[in-house]
Amino acid sequence: MTKLRKIIHIDMDYFFAQVEEKANPSLKDKPFAVGGTNPKRGVISTCNYIAREYGVRSAMPTAIAMQKCPNLILLNTDFAKYKAASAVIRDIFYSFTDKVEPLSLDEAYLDVTDVKEYKNSATLIAQAIKQEIFNKTGLTGSAGVAPNKLLAKIASDINKPNGLYVVTPKQVDSFVKDLPVKKLFGVGKVSQEKLKSTGVETCLDLQQLSLATLVDKFGKFGSSLYNYARGIDNREVNPVRIRKSVSVENTYLEDLKTLGACLEKLPSLYDKLTSRITEEHYKSIIGIVVKFTDTKFNKTSLTRVAKILDKEMLKNLIIELHQKQNHPIRLIGIGVKLGEIDDKQIDLF
């Protein structure tokens, strides 16, 4: 009999904005956003919940955000500050278990299956982690507790901010049936549109499609979709995963018809990418990459050798790649390629 796993997904609430709010309490009752400080060409990185009440959202052009909320305060990003807070939070994770899989500065998976403290209750452990984070940083995070990574991540988003949601093994079937398929890991806008065209909008709808049908439509990912629709996810929490790259991408609802439109998206993508890169990643960068998907679903990319993440080089890659395009752009991705860390070189510093 397979041992039931106990997985926690912790996702810090409006992390960049919350760190800024903690550093400057006068912001607490005011609508503000981080990033996108150029009112004409900027893009919002994140915002507090007061700003969200006005309709301001992450990745929104600053000009639109200011129309929705004319008194919106704009702050420059301060990654040194965010990384310092993230380091404290990560140490807290490791004080509970060694099985920690960081996803970015503000979220991680923890496998607490074998943790004996707190009556071996994942719910009690999640509560303790949240409390410890608040005690040491003054910041709140939301937690999802479930038998696997898929459901834990979905659960962590349900009661935000400062929430906790638990999906027990007996609740899995009822929990997943009404879930929109867009909540499933790996289902982006393109996959969502493809599923919707066949009448699939919820996991219950997805359960009606056979494994063979899904594999035929989605290839290898079809097998994963078949399992995810049933709340099955066998991915392990991987504390020592060796990453070959770190990347971010965004699919845009409005096609990007000009080079200028593409370049306007770089600041928000860059901020998102740097938030996911750890100190160890910075030491092992061997290249940077830009990729496009156009409206005909043609995929192109360019990679350049680099030892650092350089925004100007990314801009030049976007310009170079755009010259090869024949159709408007639907998706832009940027990232870094990682290699082996040279320990001898690190010791010199």
UniProtKB/Swiss-Prot annotation:
Enzyme class: transferase
The enzyme's E.C. designation: 2.7.7.7
Co-factor remark: Binds 2 magnesium ions per subunit.
Site residues (Substrate discrimination), renumbered to this chain: 16
InterPro entries: DNA/RNA_pol_sf (IPR043502), DNA_pol_Y-fam_lit_finger_sf (IPR036775), DNA_pol_Y-fam_little_finger (IPR017961), DNA_polymerase-Y (IPR050116), DNApol_IV (IPR022880), IMS_HHH_1 (IPR053848), Rev_trsase/Diguanyl_cyclase (IPR043128), UmuC (IPR001126)
GO cellular component assignments: cytosol
Compartments in which it is found: Cytoplasm
Residue ranges annotated for the UmuC domain, each copy included: 7-188
Catalytic residues of the enzyme: 107
SUPFAM superfamilies referenced in this protein's UniProt entry, alphabetically: DNA/RNA polymerases, Lesion bypass DNA polymerase (Y-family), little finger domain
Biological process annotations from GO: DNA-templated DNA replication; error-prone translesion synthesis; SOS response
Record-level Gene Ontology MF annotations: damaged DNA binding; DNA-directed DNA polymerase activity; magnesium ion binding
Keywords: Cytoplasm, DNA damage, DNA repair, DNA replication, DNA-binding, DNA-directed DNA polymerase, Magnesium, Metal-binding, Mutator protein, Nucleotidyltransferase, Transferase
Cofactor: Mg(2+)
The family this protein is said to belong to: Belongs to the DNA polymerase type-Y family.
Summary of the function given for this chain in its UniProt record: Poorly processive, error-prone DNA polymerase involved in untargeted mutagenesis. Copies undamaged DNA at stalled replication forks, which arise in vivo from mismatched or misaligned primer ends. These misaligned primers can be extended by PolIV. Exhibits no 3'-5' exonuclease (proofreading) activity. May be involved in translesional synthesis, in conjunction with the beta clamp from PolIII.
PANTHER family listed in its UniProt record: DNA POLYMERASE KAPPA (PTHR11076:SF33), DNA REPAIR POLYMERASE UMUC / TRANSFERASE FAMILY MEMBER (PTHR11076)
Record protein name field: DNA polymerase IV
Species per Swiss-Prot/TrEMBL record: Francisella tularensis subsp. mediasiatica (strain FSC147)
